[in-house]
């Protein structure tokens, strides 16, 4: 745990050195690993408890499913973000992500009150104007799948488009696959 905390300290010192209080510093982490010897929520929570003492603005939790429940360690059976938010609430903003595509997905995530911010990657790749579609509650206009026949619908660079068509867990779901 010493290394990530020293990296955060170094970033904060540089911000102070150049007198840039507006420079936002955060920490992104994956909360739990599925393998036997992987990181558990116990280790994650120890790190989170130290991070909230630092002058950072956010902690970003990266996971496949926003509502994923803890498998091992602290908080077993409870949503990871809920466990983490108990520690971060009022101290540092928490950003959550994971498998949010539809208007209903985003609404459910917001209503959970597990986080201050919601991030999205794949849904943004599928919808150039996702923020507007969500704000205007245009549920039926939100693309949930990548249409491989119509690349013009997206702002995806050619190399990334080729990867998207092949498919992968970390890419948007593709129609017909």
Task: Give the residues covered by each predicted segment.
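Flavin-dependent oxidoreductase catalytic cores
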Residues: 1-177
